[in-house]
Amino acid sequence: MTTSVYSNLKFLGIACVVAVAAVLGACSEDDLADKSVITVDKVDYTEFDYWLQRNYVKPYNISFKYRFEDIESDMNYYTIPARYELAVKLAHLVKYVCIEAYDEVGGIDFTRAYFPKMIFTIGEWEYRNNGTYILCTAEGGRKILLSGVNYLEEHLGNADDLNTYYLQTIHHEFTHILNQTVNYSADFQLISGADYVADKWSQAPFNTGCLQRGFISSYAQHSHVEDFAEMLAMFVCNSERQWDAWMAEAGPEGERIITTKLEMVKEYMLSAFGIDLEALRSALQRRQFEVTSGLVDLDDLSLD
């Protein structure tokens, strides 16, 4: 009985060895694939890609990403990709009203040196739990996220809307990047001192009456860092007439505080980067008017 079991096991062992050898032999005879089984996402170049190469990458070394990428997104928010045709319009808008305005006033070398090297776009706003939503963010001085691209069409003919949802936020975030390169005077944060309220800026009573308290916007009350960026962005993106109306609403004390801050912002930009904010505002206002008046073709992808 023992001998029979042993013989059977021995036979099975030999059979297994033969089977394995046959399998390995068969495998060794197969031709290896000439392509790796590990693939990287590949995309077909569009007219837009070639236009971006000519107008963003070549002159400025800026990557304008309009295709959705998980790695560039903030997974704390639900969002969607930017629509192709609206990403095209936004790329024109950013180039004409922002990038080329800095070229005009500060020279192309300034823009090449300091403007963020990546612009990543998403279709939806990033909504927060406190009832606000994120329009734009800057990361590490090299990347700007632009959200809400899919709403661009409805705002293109209105300068105030373009400022509120897109242009002011771009200049605001660019200011943060400049501040990371050259810091502003610590005296700035002493002007409003203990009046900053952090995340309470969007809640009553801080969501009204900011001008009278010496802040150019409600969000400027968040911190001195946001206050500085808001001062620059709100000044260059809005007309002299609008600014004067805000100062009248602010009253004597509010106007005094805001004017003190503005002078420090102007001095910072001129001394640190050679940028005249009055000249920059003039350039932006002219370019903004040309866009909202339909004088700039935001769909043109020609390479001529």
Per-range role (PLM):
Residues 196-278, 287-304:
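Metalloprotease/metallohydrolase-associated module, dominated by Zn2+-dependent proteases
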Residues 62-82:
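Acidic/histidine-rich, surface-exposed loop or edge segments in extracytoplasmic proteins
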Residues 102-120, 181-182, 242-252, 277-283:
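Surface-exposed patches in mature extracellular/periplasmic domains of secreted proteins
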Residues 1-11, 17-67, 293-304:
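Bacterial Sec-dependent N-terminal signal peptides
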Residues 180-199:
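Short acidic alpha-helical/loop segments enriched in Asp/Glu that coordinate divalent cations
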Residues 160, 164-185, 229:
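Active-site recognition of the HExxH zinc-binding catalytic motif
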Residues 31-32, 88-143:
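Auxiliary, metal-adjacent structural segments of Zn-dependent hydrolase domains
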Residues 76-84, 132, 153-165, 214-222, ...:
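Second-shell loop/turn segments in exported
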